[in-house]
A protein has these predicted regions:
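N-terminal export signals
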Residues: 2-26
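Histidine-centered catalytic micro-motifs
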Residues: 86-92, 130
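Short, conserved beta-strand element in jelly-roll/cupin
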Residues: 78, 91-106
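Acidic/histidine-enriched, glycine/proline-rich intrinsically disordered or flexible terminal extensions
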Residues: 156, 160-187
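A short glycine-rich, His/Asp/Glu-containing loop-to-beta-strand
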Residues: 50-87
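C-terminal segment of N-terminal export signals and the immediately downstream linker at the start
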Residues: 20-55, 159
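Ligand-binding loop in jelly-roll beta-barrel domains
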Residues: 125-151
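Short acidic-glycine-tyrosine-enriched beta hairpin
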Residues: 111-125
Length: 187
């Protein structure tokens, strides 16, 4: 009888322990978050870090994973050439893009959308997607939720002296928890 009582008591205490662990984790997240608001000026990056994709197009961190304890990262991309990434999947992240200027073609699953100034698009996790800048100049905000390894991904791309081969690109994507599943958009 003692064993049965012990097992019943232990089983009943599991939800309480899980709740306490969740509360402790939540408190830790709050401690690690930025405690103050902040401003990042136009043309600047959160910690003064400059990343240029292809050596030409600034991709500035506006809200860092450090600010949100990994919950969210926001970038401002200023595209100075046409083109975009290969078709890929983020298994763990949703993305949102807001077009500030220019024209962009997005592919999400089997659908394609042309976005211009003021448009927003949501890209759910686990859905193949890509985009291409159609205009000579373009600017957009985009965010990842949760952050994942995206800040490091763009640092690696920004440090490249030349465009990676498709194989090198696929490895860079894989190293940052993404999967390349097709080529960039043709336009």
């Amino acid at each position: 009888m003692q064993r049965r009582k012990f097992l019943s008591t232990a089983a009943l205490s599991l939800p309480v322990l899980a709740f306490a662990n969740q509360q402790a984790s939540s408190s830790e997240n709050k401690r690690n978050r930025t405690g103050k608001g902040f401003v990042v000026k136009s043309g600047q990056s959160r910690f003064g870090e400059q990343t240029k994709l292809g050596g030409k197009s600034p991709n500035d961190i506006k809200v860092s994973t450090k600010d949100t304890n990994g919950d969210l990262t926001i970038f401002e991309y200023t595209g100075n050439e046409k083109g975009g990434p290969p078709l890929h999947i983020h298994p763990n992240q949703d993305e949102i893009f807001f077009i500030m200027s220019g024209s962009f073609l997005f592919k999400v699953g089997e659908e394609q959308f042309t976005l211009t100034t003021g448009d927003t698009i949501f890209l759910p996790r686990n859905v193949p997607h890509t985009w291409a800048q159609l205009s000579e100049q373009g600017k957009m905000y985009f965010q990842f939720q949760p952050s994942g390894k995206m800040e490091d991904f763009f640092r690696v791309l920004g440090a490249l002296k030349a465009a990676p081969s498709p194989e090198q690109g696929a490895k860079i994507f894989a190293d940052h928890d993404m999967q390349v599943v097709g080529p960039p958009l043709s336009f």
